[in-house]
């Protein structure tokens, strides 16, 4: 797990909320505090659909327009937390050249990204959850490095905190 302090908040938020750089991820949870608190869970409500959806998880690209609409205006949110889970496609994109991609495919841990904005500071935090206990940290270290490299490839200034 690493924490990346983002120095270019506006640019980072554009990549998160406007561009498609994280669209392949699944939403775990989002909380935004403006004049009132908005909370969004990443589980799909099957009763809302006429036909059962193929996936019970919600992709970030489905939720971000709602979040963006909620926060746009003259005032920035007091607080915002967005937790994403990497999809298989996103994990492949970031880990395919890491040397641990085959191990990732065997173990299939949950790879997480959390974006936290509070008190005019934005941080990205990586995370990983294994189905079984392991002392092997290779996937975790590769995920941390891949996320840091990905953020830098987007042209966003970040430093480990």
Residue map of PLM features:
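Mixed-charge, glycine-accented linear interaction segment located at domain edges/termini
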Residues: 122-161
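Generic "edge-of-domain/loop-turn" microfeature
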Residues: 23, 27, 31-32, 89-91, ...
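Generic structural motif
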Residues: 9, 38, 43, 85-91, ...
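Short, surface-exposed, charged/polar-biased interaction segments
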Residues: 30, 34, 39, 43, ...
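Charge-rich, low-complexity N-terminal segments
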Residues: 1-62
């Amino acid at each position: 797990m690493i924490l990346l302090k983002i120095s270019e908040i506006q640019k980072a938020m554009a990549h998160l909320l406007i561009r498609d750089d994280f669209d392949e991820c699944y939403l775990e949870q989002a909380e935004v505090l403006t004049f009132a608190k908005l909370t969004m869970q990443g589980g799909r409500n099957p009763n809302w659909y006429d036909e059962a959806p193929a996936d019970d998880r919600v992709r970030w690209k489905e939720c971000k327009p709602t979040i963006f609409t909620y926060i746009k205006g003259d005032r920035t949110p007091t607080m915002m937390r967005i937790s994403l889970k990497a999809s298989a496609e996103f994990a492949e994109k970031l880990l395919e050249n890491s040397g641990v991609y085959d191990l990732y495919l065997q173990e299939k841990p949950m790879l997480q990204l959390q974006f936290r904005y509070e008190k005019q500071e934005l941080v990205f935090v990586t995370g990983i959850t294994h189905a079984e206990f392991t002392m092997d940290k290779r996937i975790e270290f590769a995920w941390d490095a891949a996320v840091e490299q990905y953020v830098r490839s987007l042209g966003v200034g970040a430093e480990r905190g």
